[in-house]
Regions:
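Histidine-acidic metal/acid-base catalytic patches
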Residues: 1-32, 124, 150-172, 176-272
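Short, small-residue-rich loop/turn micro-motifs
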Residues: 7, 61, 68-71, 104-109, ...
Length: 272
């Protein structure tokens, strides 16, 4: 069991210092991190950068564990929904070049112009088409619990059941369930048979936290083991179920991202 690092964990550094994907790979190499998750949102020009990044990963002995996209099917415009599908389709050859067989996907964002029922139909339609294409390439799409459309365990399970594809599973984000006022262990009871990818994240309840739940509770991101998520029990239950996929750190705390990442890796070592 090894902890992979999502590039999202340094998203503030990327924004503030103009980091490229290659800069992230260099950071991981210096930190001794041997597994990474890359995201399509961080490419400046994927066609140009990808071969260089693949070569850098190989030369530094770093393995990509997964790839992630930020598609949104909750659009009342058919062309926008097609663009969301294309975003996933375009990720398939990138994932193959990186040597990964898991792509994290989203459902979409609920807005005042879109009803839940309409959005659910569009999400199912889009993910079904995407999963069919991914399956032909030997890749599994993993739907993250994120936002209001696929935020709870029951919502994610409903989408997976309707798509009904062996190539669409769950990215179990340990922290995001708190933002829809659901205990992560409760969600795990619902999804444990569907989990093929884990985003390891911790949140703590704080009055001035930046992240608000649907009920108005404030949370802040912290290093693993410093928050309210029972990460040790999640790992125990997944191990008992035979889970052998990746655990991917998504650090979303304040302060130094590098230090938050280091503390998270130290904590993860106590779970081994």
């Amino acid at each position: 069991m090894e902890l992979s690092l999502s590039m999202w964990s340094v998203h503030r550094t990327v924004r503030e210092n103009g980091w490229t994907v290659l800069d992230f790979v260099d950071f991981c190499n210096k930190e001794g991190i041997k597994q990474v998750e890359l995201l399509n949102v961080f490419w400046k020009n994927a066609a140009i950068e990808l071969p260089t990044v693949v070569a850098a990963l190989k030369s530094k002995g770093i393995r990509a564990s997964s790839y992630a996209v930020a598609n949104d099917f909750a659009k009342d415009n058919a062309e926008e929904r097609q663009a969301a599908l294309q975003e996933i389709l375009d990720a398939i050859p990138v994932a193959q070049a990186l040597g990964v067989n898991v792509i994290r996907v989203f459902s979409g964002n609920l807005t005042e112009h879109v009803t839940y029922d309409n959005a659910l139909g569009w999400i199912v339609e889009g993910l079904r088409a995407a999963a069919e294409a991914a399956g032909k390439a030997g890749i599994t799409l993993c739907l993250e619990n994120h936002g209001k459309l696929a935020g709870s365990g029951v919502q994610v399970k409903a989408i997976l059941d309707r798509v009904n594809s062996p190539y669409l599973k769950s990215t179990f984000d340990t922290g995001n369930f708190l933002l829809v006022d659901e205990e992560p262990l409760t969600a795990l009871d619902v999804l444990i048979g569907e989990v093929a990818h884990v985003h390891f994240k911790d949140f703590v309840r704080l009055p001035d936290g930046r992240y608000k739940s649907l009920a108005g509770t404030s949370f802040e991101g912290v290093s693993l083991g410093l928050g309210d998520v029972d990460l040790a029990e999640i790992v125990r239950r997944l191990k008992a179920r035979g889970y052998e996929g990746a655990y991917v750190l998504e650090y979303e705390g304040l302060g130094s991202e590098a230090e938050g990442i280091r503390k998270s890796y130290e904590y993860f070592g106590t779970l081994l």
